A protein has these predicted regions:
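AAA+ P-loop NTPase catalytic core and its hallmark functional loops
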Residues: 1-191
């Protein structure tokens, strides 16, 4: 599909994922809301249509280029805490909140947007050490042990390998967890 059709599909998805019933519960359960993945050549407007779609739907948008992150900034930093199991005390490792998840909460407080899109750009260019974290993120909507807030949709974008030498092909496990939208270059839709 072209970028204009992709934008319309994104808007439909945002409306479907943010719709609630009379009890203020999501019409589509959060566990069934698959992240959107826009895959297409660089420069065709994938990021721009995310901005346009979020504005059209009145939801927030927080964008991250994942290649700028390390495993620690995505998952959080380890810290030692004391826990008692049975009658014995242990020192165990837990993780601080991810910089990315923390930014969503800060954005919500700053803007008042309780619903939004967490947009991860260049998702298929992550380092090898971050790839398992991205798989967990796509499946469970978590970075480390912290979850993306309810009401927030996950969307991502990437480029096919012929456009970027650092692309890591997404495996079937990752592709099975997303709603893939192939976006083709179509100059005519910009005229």
């Amino acid at each position: 599909m072209n970028i204009k059709e992709a934008k319309e599909e994104i808007i439909r998805t945002i409306k479907a994922y943010t719709a609630v019933d009379e009890d203020d519960q999501p019409v589509i359960p959060i566990s069934a809301q698959r992240p959107l993945l826009l895959m297409g050549p660089p420069g065709i407007g994938k990021t721009a249509v995310m901005e346009q779609a979020s504005k059209a739907c009145g939801v927030g948008l927080l964008s991250y280029t994942i290649t700028h992150h390390t495993r620690q900034s995505a998952v959080g930093l380890p810290e030692l805490v004391h826990r008692t199991y049975g009658e014995k005390e242990y020192t165990v490792t837990q993780y601080t909140m991810s910089e990315i998840i923390g930014s969503v909460y800060e954005y919500m407080e700053r803007t008042g947007h309780k619903k939004g899109i967490l947009f991860i750009d260049e998702i298929n260019c992550v380092s090898e050490t971050l790839a398992p974290t991205i798989l967990q993120f796509l499946q469970f909507k978590t970075f480390g042990t912290h979850k993306v807030p309810d009401g927030w949709i996950i969307a991502a974008a990437g480029n096919p390998s012929e456009y970027n030498a650092s692309v890591r092909e997404l495996d079937m496990a990752a592709l099975d967890r997303v709603r893939l939208i192939h976006v083709e270059a179509d100059f005519g839709v910009w005229e």
